[in-house]
Amino acid sequence: MLRFAITLFAVITSSTCQQYGCLEGDTHKANPSPEPNMHECTLYSESSCCYANFTEQLAHSPIIKVSNSYWNRCGQLSKSCEDFTKKIECFYRCSPHAARWIDPRYTAAIQSVPLCQSFCDDWYEACKDDSICAHNWLTDWERDESGENHCKSKCVPYSEMYANGTDMCQSMWGESFKVSESSCLCLQMNKKDMVAIKHLLSESSEESSSMSSSEEHACQKKLLKFEALQQEEGEERR
Ligand SMILES: *[C@@H]1O[C@H](CO)[C@@H](O)[C@H](O)[C@H]1NC(C)=O
Ligand SMILES: *[C@@H]1O[C@H](CO)[C@@H](O)[C@H](O)[C@H]1NC(C)=O
């Protein structure tokens, strides 16, 4: 029975990998593959859409620039805010599952990736005293000839730019993210995403907004198990 479950899981994972591949951004691979030497974004090292060398840019705090975007146009981000920004960058560049939410009009982009409310609230809390000048980081910049970003408007605190975590998550990267009504079928950019992803992938993208309550229930149950297991591992290590 266990062997059957493992085989089935292998079939499901390999078919979803083939189905989705990677996004078509400038740093993305065609298909995810292992990257054992990643400096950052190690959540995705078993199956990654970015090369390990991409993550070198994220390895030293303060992070000044990633690809051709400066992160410090309104001063250096605080360490806690930087950490959240890095999680989003890692997901977009490296997650083998990001393409599940590919924007059909623009295949380098994602749309409506479900984030957990708690993740957005924590992110907002971490950044609220940092400053930015772009409401939408994808579009609200002046780009020079080399494609580097410059402020178009004045720098203001995050807490002035966005009303709350929900507003921030749903505005900062355009349509890329939405806050989920579920506390389980949503991503928070840590190991628990494994549980959520498994359930989210079993739904077709059209139905994702009306996720069935049985899927929700199954997810919650798995998450509890997963948390118990993590706690056990933590205690063994002590
Ligand atoms: C990163 O590594 C990949 C594969 O090893 C290579 O194709 C690419 O050119 C490298 N990129 C940079 C910026 O070094
Ligand atoms: C968050 O801000 C939005 C936009 O201003 C508002 O509609 C929403 O009610 C706020 N949510 C909470 C929980 O305060």
From Swiss-Prot:
User: Any idea which residues bear Pyrrolidone carboxylic acid here?
Assistant: Q18
Q: Which residues cross the membrane?
A: none
According to the record, glycans are attached at: N53, N164
Query: What post-translational events are described?
Result: Plasma and yolk RBPS have the same carbohydrate components, whereas egg-white RBP has a different, ovomucoid-type carbohydrate chain.
Q: Which UniProt keywords apply?
A: Disulfide bond, Glycoprotein, Phosphoprotein, Pyrrolidone carboxylic acid, Signal, Transport
Name of the protein in question: Riboflavin-binding protein
Q: In which tissues is it expressed?
A: Yolk RBP is synthesized in the liver; egg-white RBP is synthesized in the oviduct.
Disulfide bond sites: C22-C49, C41-C90, C50-C94, C74-C155, C81-C127, C116-C186, C120-C169, C133-C151, C184-C219
Q: Which GO terms describe its cellular component?
A: external side of plasma membrane
Sequence positions bearing Phosphoserine: S204, S205, S208, S209, S210, S212, S213, S214
Primary role? Required for the transport of riboflavin to the developing oocyte.
Q: Pfam families of this UniProt entry? A: Folate_rec
